[in-house]
């Protein structure tokens, strides 16, 4: 498909919310029906998010007609050619109307009531009584109407799915006079579908709860007046006023005030973060302390929380490898069950003199056992639950495929700067070595000189001066010069001062540059610090060390990864060998690669993949973007603060720390284990039930209970992923 055609289709994409999906098969059928609508070029259902993307033109009425088999309700979320999508609260576009249980399942309740009266009549009047039979027939017709409606259509089209199996089984049971069991099959199948829908709704709740995090209105100052307006009407550049205890409604930058903001909704951090002027704040976070004024930087549809919701919903719709296997398996599984059921019903009576009633009954039971409900939902509920749980805890997983891949990772490569370290250099050591100069005076001279340099570590020295209230702007510097590869020099009050490496002072032949002093400098360098000497042509005045501080969590994270069985942890950095070794040894990585350019990091990741197959790379998503893209799973940090991180990586840690990484690994592994357990259990219980055919013990009761039991247990097992905690 040409790029122009793809772009045209994207421009014609309409997004609709869908209410009423009961199973993944129904979602697939709805997608097929929508594709047949004239004017529709393509359609893609996102079962996890309960949405459909329609490429082309189709009315809501046409879409609902395509979903009439399941009584689906459709509402537009984003229509083509609309630059801004505004959905107010009163549209209820994102929320299903809450219907009372008795109304939502009225037919099921009435059919169940008829069964109860049917069994009462059975005990009072007997099995062959007309009243008894009519009560069971009434239950079958009322409770199974929607089932038969779809089942007959599928049968005519030779489209074999679970509803086709159930329809044939119920009709067959009624033909051979098993009214009571046929009605039980109908009711229990309806209950199974209701439970399946409930399970999916529960797993979607984590994302729906994110939608309600950010306030729909905000206090904004316009033309000197403070007014409360809807977030859809707030423009970039508006000043929003947020009082203590209020949630922040929009993304922006603080222009006035100080506060502590709880960012748990976005980053998963439980500890409030201090915020001051020029700091960024996000919609959905809680202003805990001071009153702040925020300049809006993004429209409501572009806020970080909106992007998270959108990406998570897209991720829930992505089919994981396990889901692809299940879908492919189910495609052949259902027809095979139909054939097995036919053979069970026909072969024993024809060739072995068996009773037709007995073996037809056994064949019908095989159809019920063969219903792939549990198998079909084994993966989607797990993926939706896991991705939703991860999002609430500050880990954005962009698809089930990455969730599965992360679970198989045995090697993790870390970019050093901004990942294992904070990425911001700070002054760690400052020692005055000459009694003739005061500490503050010397630091003031150092700062005045560094202020004029282009050295990347100069910002750390200036920041230290500001923190300690050391003035430097009034220091007059003359004849400032950068000494390439050595340091800098300048004249202050008639004295020439030098700041630079030990090599510079060796060349100057400074008298008090001793071997012992040089060893002290090497000790600082071996600690991962950059040591700079300040002095004149005659004497050394002091030494200052600057370093990119290691994150407090880095060492603990590496230990947890090793405990999880990830033995190969590698640090990649452009730093020199000494600095790299100091930091790598401190955090406990198993291998250290230093003095690497971005291309070298990419080449190293490719080399590691050839050796270990599955390699995860974690960085900030900026200068290490090629390596992230080449890895099996690319993980970016600080996703809340940069669009680049979210777009580049397969997984984004929304908070600016590593502590969520072990949680993401544990969650992915648990997801894989639960999916495997679900598939094994769903298939295993059916095999056991089918084996009961051999001695003739399989009944419709056993068949429906095994199917329903498997569905319930698989759903409940999958929902456990919503409770995995970030330890």
Swiss-Prot record:
Active site: 415
Induction statement: By cadmium.
EC number in record: 7.2.2.21
Similarity field: Belongs to the cation transport ATPase (P-type) (TC 3.A.3) family. Type IB subfamily.
Protein name per Swiss-Prot or TrEMBL: Cadmium-transporting ATPase
Membrane topology classification: Multi-pass membrane protein
Transmembrane segments annotated in the record for this chain: 106-126, 130-150, 171-191, 336-356, 364-384, 672-694, 699-721
Gene, per the UniProt record: cadA
GO molecular function: ATP binding; ATP hydrolysis activity; metal ion binding; P-type cadmium transporter activity
Domain named HMA: residues: 12-75
Function of the protein: Couples the hydrolysis of ATP with the export of cadmium. Involved in cadmium resistance.
Stated regulation of activity: Inhibited by the antibiotic bafilomycin A1. Partially inhibited by DCCD, nigericin and FCCP.
Gene Ontology CC entries for this record: plasma membrane
Keywords: ATP-binding, Cadmium, Cadmium resistance, Cell membrane, Ion transport, Magnesium, Membrane, Metal-binding, Nucleotide-binding, Phosphoprotein, Plasmid, Translocase, Transmembrane, Transmembrane helix, Transport
Localization of this protein: Cell membrane
Gene3D superfamilies: 3.30.70.100, Calcium-transporting ATPase, cytoplasmic domain N, Calcium-transporting ATPase, cytoplasmic transduction domain A, HAD superfamily/HAD-like
GO biological process terms on file: response to cadmium ion
Pfam family, one: HMA
Binding-site positions, Cd(2+): 23, 26
PROSITE patterns: ATPASE_E1_E2, HMA_1, HMA_2
Catalysed reactions listed for this entry: Cd(2+)(in) + ATP + H2O = Cd(2+)(out) + ADP + phosphate + H(+)
